[in-house]
Structures are given as C-alpha cells and as structure tokens.
C-alpha cells in the first residue's frame, strides 16, 4: 500500500513476482495451475493481465477451481485426474497448494508421469527449496523453479512501488538460497 496523489493504492505483487521469477514471456504457453487459493488467484490474475491465453486450474475440490475461474473470468477448471491426463499438453505447471511445506507430507497434487521434457515445473513453496513435487519433477529432466524467486521478486516489486527503482534480485536470491541451505 502506498499513497498516490493523496489516495491509498494497494498492490498484489504475488502474481507478477512469480511471473518474473519464471522468466517466461511466451504468451502462447499453456499453463497448468495446481491449487485455487489466494496465491493462485494472484498468479492467475497476473497471467491474464499480461495477455496469456491458455490456463487451466486444477484443484482438489473442482468447485473451488470453477469459482476462481468464474470470478477472474479467465482459464478453465479441471480435475486433478484431467490434469494428469492432459499433462503432455502443458508447457508450464505451477504448484500453489501447501503440499510440500516442511510440516506437510510427501503427498503430491498430481503424478507427473508423461510430462514433456521441456516443461517448466514451478512450486511456490520456498522452504524447503526442493519440495517433494520438484523432487519428483527432476526425475523427468524438466526445468524446475522453487518459490524463492517469487518471494524475492514480489518484495522487489513492492520496493520499486515505494522507491521508484527495481533492486538487484540476483544477489538476494543467492543469499537466501545460501541461508536456506541450498
């Protein structure tokens, strides 16, 4: 939140922070979002704002995915089973559920068998740096991205809103990776 011409303006930097960490600018990429919570909402909204066209939301509870898609007027809701069946068609898979955090089990939202070799698999969890989901993805020789970049870029975006300049995020990511044991 900052003031702009005497008015308070709020920004959600989650989505844009995630997309900056992803480093993907091809708007024709087909995106699979796993989870339909607050973080997914911010990321989906950012994909929509940036002109992406192909996004599917899979959630444990299909109704929650449908509700999110309807509210944002973007994407399509699918089941986890449909996500697994269509896995070959996605270019980017984004895991936004709390699965994989230190206190949770090794449970995966979907199985990754059959994933394309050049797919990007991201998990917004940053502690641990390598979640069970990313560990599974690495077995298929895909590019994996943990949530640390999202954390850093959303903070950098907030900093830029307040100060007018975007800080060097490479150093931040390196230092945080070292702090988290990576």
What does each of the following model-derived ranges do?
Residues 20-24, 45-49, 70, 135, ...:
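Short, well-ordered alpha-helices that flank and scaffold nucleotide-derived cofactor binding pockets
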Residues 1-24, 130:
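Phosphate/diphosphate ligand-binding glycine-rich loop within oxidoreductases
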């Amino acid at each position: 939140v900052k003031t702009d011409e005497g008015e308070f303006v709020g920004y959600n930097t989650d989505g844009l922070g995630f997309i900056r960490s992803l480093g993907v600018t091809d708007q024709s990429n087909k995106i699979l979002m796993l989870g339909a919570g607050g973080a997914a909402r911010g990321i989906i909204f950012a994909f929509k704002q940036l002109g992406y066209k192909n996004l599917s939301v899979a959630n444990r509870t299909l109704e929650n995915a449908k509700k999110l898609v309807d509210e944002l007027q973007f994407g399509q809701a699918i089941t986890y089973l449909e996500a697994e069946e269509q896995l070959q068609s996605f270019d980017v898979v984004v895991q936004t559920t709390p699965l994989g955090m230190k206190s949770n089990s090794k449970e995966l939202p979907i199985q990754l068998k059959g994933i394309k070799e050049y797919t990007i698999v991201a998990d917004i969890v940053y502690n641990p740096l390598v979640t069970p989901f990313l560990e599974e993805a690495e077995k298929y020789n895909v590019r994996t991205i943990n949530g640390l970049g999202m954390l850093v870029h959303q903070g950098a975006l907030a900093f830029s809103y307040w100060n007018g300049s975007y800080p060097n995020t490479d150093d931040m990511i390196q230092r945080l990776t070292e702090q988290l044991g990576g």
